[in-house]
Amino acid sequence: MWENKFAKESLTFDDVLLIPAASDVLPNDADLSVELSERIKLNIPVISAGMDTVTESKMAIAMARQGGLGVIHKNMGIEEQAEEVQKVKRSENGVITNPFYLTPDESVYEAEALMGKYRISGVPIVSDKESRELVGILTNRDLRFIEDFSIKISDVMTKENLITAPVGTTLDEAETILQEHKIEKLPLVENGRLEGLITIKDIEKVLEFPHAAKDAHGRLLAAAAIGTSKDTEIRAQKLVEAGVDALIIDTAHGHSSGVIQEVKKMKEKYPEITIVAGNVATAEATRALFEAGADVVKVGIGPGSICTTRVVAGVGVPQITAIYDCATEARKFGKAIIADGGIKFSGDIIKALAAGGHAVMLGSLLAGTEESPGATEVFQGRQYKVYRGMGSLGAMEKGSNDRYFQEDKTPRKFVPEGIEGRTAYKGPLQDTIYQLMGGVRAGMGYTGSPDLKTLRDEAQFTRMGPAGLAESHPHNVQITKESPNYSF
């Protein structure tokens, strides 16, 4: 032990390059899909971080539509986080199997509140909540000129000539019915009982986002962060009830007894939910979490742009080595790891994937997009969005202190492991994802990798020094026009 104290040398993204190989792979033909677990299949290997300036429902919806996954942060109340998950799960459906419904005796005000809360344009009306016999439908058109919202729904709903379809109707069949009758919502009934709903908006979204990441019911995938605090059990329960697909047990040090016990507890209670645990940076930690029941392990101690763990606590492993060591252990279990942090360019993504990551988690690269929840501000004539680490004072005061095992401390006693800052505004998420995945596709073409498994198994690295890094970036020239995928 003592003799080997300084034996390990570690590498990060700027220390290595992928070696080009013989290839018949065209970048546009590269397969970017990945299976993280039995129930989580993504069409791009990208996950947005569970940070309070990166991912809420708006980002999670946009990520899933691009084929990735969003992790809704936990710096909010339990009910609020569950509602954020519900917004994602209800934003897009092949067939809505559990549609919202109201009864004729409820008020128009209640209908307006429900439709506003979940941003829906109509709701089926049933005779009562037990029999659920369909008796009408209420849409925005029915409410357009209403002034007295205390009246009953029965006074304004559409009752006559309701257009319905039987359970089992396909989306193609539903589209024909909707277009023929010029309606937007098609209730699915069986013996008069409301059993489902298909909307024209959902059909349009299927056509607009053909590569969206969805569950077995055609709903967008959603993940949510939990911790190891006192409210974790009830938080997890509410998230599962809301339809979450993956629970991220998110801590700064995943190789700790509290996290391992939490993984065991969650996997035992929710075997159908994908359990992701982290963060770790060693093979031993990876093994411990997989043996505890984790489906996926998240790798990264201190590589993030807003993280100060390595300089405050003096702890961490440079990210490429951490990914490789953890992936080597994960291969023994036939399970996946997520490379979390330190990624500055699309080239870093493909390096992380080639080193053994099944997917990457991004914070700073996505924090400047339109869909992130960070506040927009103007500085020296340019637009920026606020971006902060979950170990920053502001985030810890809002609730992330348990991530750093400081739940019992008052704000004055917090020892932060992150900073608060700003990042340039980038516009819509889809533009950023397009550029990032374009870089990954290019790398797969250079390395002759038709899919991500081949990239993980066969791609080779070369080490480089500071001169090699300087040579890799533009040099001996003044950049006069910025590129959409490069800033330094």
UniProtKB/Swiss-Prot annotation:
K(+) binds at residues 302, 304, 307, 471-473. The keyword Oxidoreductase applies. Its EC number is 1.1.1.205. IMP binds at residues 305, 340-342, 363-364, 387-391, 417. It comes from the Bacteria. Residues 95-153, 157-213 form the CBS domain. GO terms for biological process: GMP biosynthetic process; GTP biosynthetic process. HAMAP family: IMPDH. This is Inosine-5'-monophosphate dehydrogenase. The lineage of its organism: Bacteria, Bacillati, Bacillota, Bacilli, Bacillales. The gene is guaB.
